Design a protein with these regions (language model features):
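A short, Trp-centered hydrophobic/proline-enriched beta-strand micro-motif
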Residues: 118-126, 170
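Flexible, small-/acidic-enriched active-site or ligand-binding loops
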Residues: 137-139, 191-220
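Short Gly/Pro-enriched turn/cap motifs at secondary-structure boundaries
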Residues: 89, 115, 130-133, 157-160, ...
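Short Ser/Thr-interspersed hydrophobic loop/turn segments at strand-loop and sheet-helix junctions
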Residues: 49, 73-77, 171, 188-193, ...
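A short core secondary-structure module
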Residues: 152-197
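Long, acidic (Asp/Glu-rich), low-complexity accessory segments flanking structured domains
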Residues: 217-236
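N-terminal glycine-rich flavin-associated loop
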Residues: 84-106, 132
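Alpha-helical interface subdomain recognition
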Residues: 1-83, 103-107, 118-119, 144-149, ...
Length: 384
């Protein structure tokens, strides 16, 4: 079993890390404080080739495999110290762009070149005020009217919602089909009549990425914008893309864990207490050791899940195991890092404070930790 990445992948990781350190990290603190998404920075990510990684080159992407895509998001997080930006990139790629690549017809794939270059931003709208973890209970309706569909309903907690140029909207087209069935996906463009942004939500962490409330009031969408097969979108499109989302999402978390550990080591060597650097204190050494163990285990679980998906092998349980563990490990490391920094870890001038607020998202977004446990248990019971 070879755990090494290829020389090309390692060189790519370094190039993304260095780019992020030089372009993304400056201003990360200010973007967090202001809760501001930076469109100019987004364009630079597009120019660097980070916004269409897995999409084939003929559509403007890089044709990268999922492992390389994860490496890019890990490096972006480690070098850039901006979890919000990483969240927006991950959502744009995995649930805003990949569904059009995998399920769109050739006419619909006209959206891809603008998405992969960063000219446009993508999002997916599933969650509703009364349908979060229970995605099968969505109420947003789409009714056929000649060559159009009329959408009515609201969506909440939509990453990139207020900045997206295209939103893939899940809506019920056959209410008689039962929960989880009769759901279709529609590509809705910014500016479509009846589509509006309610407001952006004020978040604890990942604050440079907008999280939005969206409204669809008699929103008329052409039938040509129906993505995939009518009535099968929740299972065929959404749940498939959740595998992409969860894996890439935790890659960003692993990159953040690496950055926190490095910062904690550096601070422990510099901070003097009782006449010597606190790195000489066994209590601090134990915290650093725990952080390293959590990081290495998280990274191995991440790339096991990514490798299984890349090889076309069963991976849903392993992806949920990885997300469940990384959610806990990222939070534990953020707490330990903050404790090492002491009082300085509690003030906003130091990135370690931001890491704790950012880390909490992983146990909630993209499927809560409780949902991951349900998926894992279901897989175990089916296997045995």
């Amino acid at each position: 079993m070879d755990f090494r990445h290829s020389e090309e992948q390692l060189a790519f990781y370094k190039s993304v890390h260095d780019f992020a350190a030089g372009v993304v990290e400056p201003g990360a603190h200010e973007r967090d404080v202001e809760g501001r998404f930076d469109r100019d920075l987004w364009s630079k990510l597009g120019d660097f080739g980070l916004l269409g990684l897995p999409v084939p080159e003929r559509y403007g992407g890089s044709g990268a495999d999922i492992i390389t895509t994860c490496l890019a998001l890990e490096a972006l997080a480690e070098g850039g110290h901006d979890a919000g930006l990483g969240l927006s990139v991950g959502a744009h790629v995995t649930i805003g762009t990949v569904p059009i690549w995998l399920h769109g017809n050739e006419e619909q794939k006209k959206y891809l070149p603008r998405l992969t270059t960063g000219e446009h931003i993508g999002a997916m709208a599933i969650t509703e005020p009364e349908a979060g973890s229970d995605a099968a209970s969505i109420k947003c309706r789409a009714t056929r009217d000649g060559d159009d569909w009329i959408l009515n309903g609201s969506k909440i907690f939509i990453t990139n919602g207020s900045i997206a140029d295209t939103v893939i909207v899940m809506a019920v087209t056959d209410p008689e089909a039962g929960p989880g069935h009769g759901v279709s996906a529609f590509i809705v463009e910014r500016g479509t009549s009846g589509f509006s942004v309610g407001r952006d939500l004020d978040k604890m962490g990942t604050r440079s990425s907008p999280l939005s409330l969206l409204h669809f009031d008699d929103c008329r969408v052409p039938h040509a914008n129906l993505l995939g097969t009518e009535g099968s979108a929740l299972w065929a499109i959404a749940f498939e893309c959740f595998d992409w989302e969860r894996t890439v999402m935790i890659a960003s978390s692993v990159g953040g864990m690496k950055a926190s550990l490095r910062a904690s080591i550096a601070y422990a060597k510099e901070r003097v207490a009782f006449g010597k650097p606190i790195a000489h204190q066994q209590a601090i050494q134990h915290k650093l050791a725990d952080m390293k163990a959590h990081l290495d285990a998280a990274r191995l679980l991440l790339y096991r899940a990514a490798w299984l998906k890349q090889e076309g092998l069963p991976h849903q349980t392993e992806a949920s195991v990885a997300k469940l563990f990384v959610a806990d490990a990222a939070m534990r490391n953020a707490v330990e890092g903050t404790q090492i920094f002491g009082g300085y870890g509690y003030i906003k001038e130091y990135p370690i404070e931001r890491s704790m607020r950012d880390a909490k998202l992983i146990s909630i977004g993209g499927g809560t930790s409780e949902i991951q446990k349900m998926i894992i248990a279901r897989g175990l019971l089916e296997e045995h």
